[in-house]
């Protein structure tokens, strides 16, 4: 690929952009090789700088639930752009989007719009601390909540240890109040609350951890987490940047509410789908908590581009489309057909593979033994066969299927993916496995 336009663009990019990319996973460091520079997209497809077409299962890391260039979204964005790109003042459209989000999320009474998932998670964390008057927070190893300093933490040794920074440039003092636990571990959770319950402001969790590829929080674990937060006066914060309006119309929290009577988080963080591909995110919760935010309360949060009129037009059009009858049933069926086909192809080739899906989100792993179950936490994800995944990724890429270039990232199906696209993907999988 040395003489390709992708390669020359990457070489050029590395001279002016650190690592040649503006977000690390795009550099293909995890899988090796040359990243694809995308020239255009339409429906379920991407075209790279060399003109090669790919069936897209990244979907801009989740936002493109309708596919690329959906007519209703294009029309809304084009109209909004002619009216003005940014005002730094309130608009009717941001009120409409807030109302639409609240209609779909029963746990929330108010919502604040921001520009990125990192900003939303950081703001929700500050709000939780301000509302409770406490400092300590709990997160889980393998869950990603953006790159705010307090959340860039990995676990130390033991069941419940205060975190150590994952990134250089984050002082240890910044994360001394961050407690890192093992996902799906009830024993560790109970130990943490037993030792620190009166000091914990909030627990932040990805209900389906899409930054461990695809790992669900089990029902007993989630039920106990809700009980402990209530018992100790800590807020339960659902990070639904990835799962919100993606795995179900009401997000992952609606799935837990069906299985656990009365279940709801105290605060929710959204992004990706609510922006439809534009920079937009939000955090939401009960009025009594949300009104702790400035200008009403003492918790400060602000943003020049928050509620941007073009982004809100894109998000509003997207949310209205996904509410149409049968949308999620069709999306979930296509995702299930894809995952079942991938698993069947692997079984037929004698290759161990496990996977899971919900709504339009899926993930799969290559365990090192045929008897392995789905991973339940970060350590178990790390124990899967990364080298086999890398070979599979490149085999699929060569055959025109664009999967996430990292073992730890979920995949996404859109409404634009057709049965023919899925069958073409499965044919590529069979050929890739046969060539391995």
From Swiss-Prot:
Protein name: Glutamate-1-semialdehyde 2,1-aminomutase
EC number from the UniProt entry: 5.4.3.8
Short name of one Pfam family: Aminotran_3
Keyword terms, alphabetized: Chlorophyll biosynthesis, Cytoplasm, Isomerase, Porphyrin biosynthesis, Pyridoxal phosphate
Reactions mediated catalytically: (S)-4-amino-5-oxopentanoate = 5-aminolevulinate
GO cellular component, one term: cytoplasm
UniProt subcellular location: Cytoplasm
Domain of life of the organism encoding this protein: Bacteria
Main location: cytoplasm
């Amino acid at each position: 690929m040395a003489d390709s336009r992708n390669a020359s663009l990457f070489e050029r990019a590395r001279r002016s952009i650190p690592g040649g990319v503006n977000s690390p996973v795009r550099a293909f460091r995890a899988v090796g090789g040359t990243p694809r520079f995308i020239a255009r997209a339409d429906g379920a497809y991407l075209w790279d700088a060399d003109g090669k077409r790919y069936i897209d299962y990244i979907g801009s890391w989740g936002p493109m639930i309708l596919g690329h260039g959906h007519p209703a979204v294009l029309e809304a964005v084009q109209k909004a752009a002619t009216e003005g790109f940014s005002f730094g003042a309130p608009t009717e459209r941001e009120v409409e989007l807030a109302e639409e989000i609240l209609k779909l999320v029963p746990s929330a009474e108010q919502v604040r719009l921001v520009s990125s998932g990192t900003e939303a998670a950081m703001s929700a964390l500050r709000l939780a601390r301000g509302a409770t008057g406490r400092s300590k927070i709990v997160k889980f190893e393998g869950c990603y909540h953006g790159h705010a300093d307090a959340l860039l933490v990995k676990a130390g040794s033991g069941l419940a240890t205060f975190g150590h920074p994952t990134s250089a440039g984050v002082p240890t003092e910044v994360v001394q109040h961050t407690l890192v636990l093992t996902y799906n571990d009830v024993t560790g959770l109970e130990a943490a609350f037993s030792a620190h319950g009166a000091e914990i402001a909030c627990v932040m969790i990805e209900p389906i951890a899409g930054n461990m590829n695809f790992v669900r929080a089990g029902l007993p674990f989630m039920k106990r987490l809700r009980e402990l937060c209530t018992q100790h006066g800590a807020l339960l914060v659902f990070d639904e940047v990835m799962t919100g309006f993606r795995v179900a119309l009401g997000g992952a929290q609606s799935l837990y509410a069906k299985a656990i009577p009365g279940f709801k988080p105290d605060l929710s963080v959204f992004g990706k789908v609510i922006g439809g591909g534009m920079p937009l995110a939000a955090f939401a919760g009960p009025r009594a908590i949300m009104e702790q935010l400035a200008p009403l309360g003492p918790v400060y949060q602000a943003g020049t581009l928050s509620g941007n009129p073009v982004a809100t037009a894109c998000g509003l059009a997207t949310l209205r489309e996904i509410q149409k009858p049968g949308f999620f049933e069709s999306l979930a069926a296509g995702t299930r057909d894809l995952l079942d086909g991938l698993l069947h192809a692997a079984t037929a080739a004698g290759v161990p593979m496990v996977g899971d899906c919900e709504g339009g989100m899926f993930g799969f792993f290559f365990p090192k033994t045929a008897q392995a179950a789905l991973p339940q936490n970060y350590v178990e994800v790390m124990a899967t066969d990364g080298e086999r995944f890398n070979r599979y990724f490149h085999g699929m890429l060569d055959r025109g299927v664009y999967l996430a270039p990292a073992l730890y990232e979920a995949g996404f199906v859109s409404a634009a993916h057709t049965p023919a696209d899925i069958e073409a993907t499965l044919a590529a999988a069979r050929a890739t496995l046969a060539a391995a």
